[in-house]
C-alpha cells in the first residue's frame, strides 16, 4: 500500500525570482552575491551595502537548510527596475495531533492550541487569515543583526514572517518562511508577503 502524494503549494510571484535547492550551499551563496550586485550595483563605494544585502540572503538560505526546507526562492526584482532582497523557503508538511477531521479550521485550532507547548516564537504576533482554501497563521519578528564592516559594526534589521498553512484534506500544516533585510519597513514588507500568500494555491499531485 502506497501513501498518496501530498498537494504542493504554488506561488504567483511578481517580477523575477530564482528557484534553488537550499541544500546546495555553494549555488545559493553565488546567487546571493549576484542578487546583491544587481540590487546595489558594482561600485566600489557600495561594497559595504552589498555585503549587508548578501548577508541577509545568505542567512535566509542557511536557515532554510537548517530547517530542511525543500525549496528556496530568491527575488531578483519585484518589477522591472525595482530590485528587492527577499527570500522564501517552503517546508515539508508536519502532522498535527490530536485533530478531529481534516477541515482547515479544525486542523488550525489543534495547531494553534499546541503552539504554547512548542519552541515556536513570537506567538504574540499571531495573525489569522485564509488563502488557497487553507487556514493560515502568520507569526513574525524583526531582529537586529550585527554586521562587521571595515573594522566597525553596523546594525541591520531583518524581518522574518512565518506562514503556517493547513494542508487540504490532511491533518497537516506546512510552513512557508519569508525573510528580508528590509526590516526597517516591516509594515510595507508584511503587506507584500501577505499579498504573496493571498495569491498562492495548492496543486494536486499528478497520479501515475
Regions found by a protein language model. Give the residues of each.
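Soluble, non-membrane globular domain cores that form compact, hydrophobic packing
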Residues: 2-7, 205-207
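Proline-anchored loop/turn motifs at beta-strand termini and strand-loop-strand connectors
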Residues: 7-24
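Surface-exposed amphipathic alpha-helical segments
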Residues: 17, 175-208
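Short acidic, Gly/Pro-enriched loop/turn segments at secondary-structure junctions
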Residues: 22-35, 207-208
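Mixed-charge, low-complexity intrinsically disordered segments
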Residues: 30-60, 140-141, 154
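Signature of long, low-cysteine stretches enriched in small and polar/charged residues
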Residues: 62-163
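Short, well-ordered beta-strand elements
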Residues: 87-91, 172-181
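Active-site-adjacent "gating/activation" loops or surface patches in catalytic cores
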Residues: 167-171
Amino acid at each position: 500500500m502506497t501513501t498518496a502524494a501530498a498537494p504542493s503549494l504554488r506561488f504567483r510571484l511578481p517580477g523575477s525570482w530564482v528557484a534553488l535547492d537550499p541544500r546546495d550551499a555553494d549555488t545559493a551563496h553565488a546567487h546571493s552575491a549576484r542578487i546583491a550586485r544587481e540590487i546595489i550595483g558594482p561600485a566600489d563605494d557600495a561594497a559595504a551595502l552589498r555585503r549587508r544585502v548578501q548577508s541577509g540572503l545568505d542567512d535566509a538560505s542557511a536557515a532554510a537548510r537548517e530547517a530542511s526546507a525543500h525549496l528556496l526562492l530568491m527575488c531578483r526584482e519585484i518589477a522591472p527596475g525595482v530590485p528587492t532582497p527577499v527570500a522564501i523557503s517552503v517546508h515539508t508538511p508536519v502532522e498535527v495531533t490530536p485533530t478531529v477531521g481534516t477541515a482547515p479550521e479544525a486542523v488550525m485550532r489543534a495547531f494553534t492550541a499546541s503552539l504554547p507547548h512548542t519552541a515556536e516564537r513570537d506567538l504574540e504576533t499571531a495573525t489569522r487569515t485564509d488563502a488557497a482554501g487553507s487556514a493560515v497563521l502568520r507569526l513574525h519578528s524583526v531582529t537586529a543583526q550585527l554586521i562587521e564592516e571595515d573594522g566597525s559594526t553596523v546594525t541591520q534589521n531583518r524581518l522574518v514572517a512565518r506562514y503556517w498553512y493547513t494542508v487540504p484534506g490532511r491533518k497537516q500544516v506546512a510552513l512557508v518562511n519569508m525573510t528580508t533585510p528590509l526590516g526597517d519597513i516591516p509594515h510595507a514588507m508584511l503587506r507584500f508577503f501577505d499579498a504573496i500568500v493571498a495569491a498562492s494555491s495548492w496543486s494536486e499531485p499528478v497520479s501515475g
